[in-house]
């Protein structure tokens, strides 16, 4: 038995990231006040409710303890576009996890094309087959946490004609979702 209070935050993260799997990846697109596009992946992300349609994503801080650009942008604009990551975008998505200066756009730096779908929201990554256009519903204050959970309400959803299966996170690796297993029937 492992007592969590005896572990460091890094050990807790490793334990949770290894065994709470697979974790979907929210490839979040935001814009700052000047319209600069920020794109970053987050795997502490999950559906939360269908009424209202919402997800939760936990966003950490930079090494200097200031909010990551994604968090700062969502706090200011109250909006985010979450793209699900198809396998063909894995490398660019992974590159976009690199910390850049706030005045540098991941879209430009890593050559990630975007396309505007809804004027009042950040653009989506061009070529992804599923995107959620969200508004900030609630920021959760977890006392002592190094991450900030955000509840984002889904206002619009884009689904391509032939949506691709998104990749997921398993530990520190990525995974393609494979064969679907049929659920056993329940006795009456």
Per-segment meaning from a language model:
Residues 1-188:
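Basic, polyanion-binding surface patches
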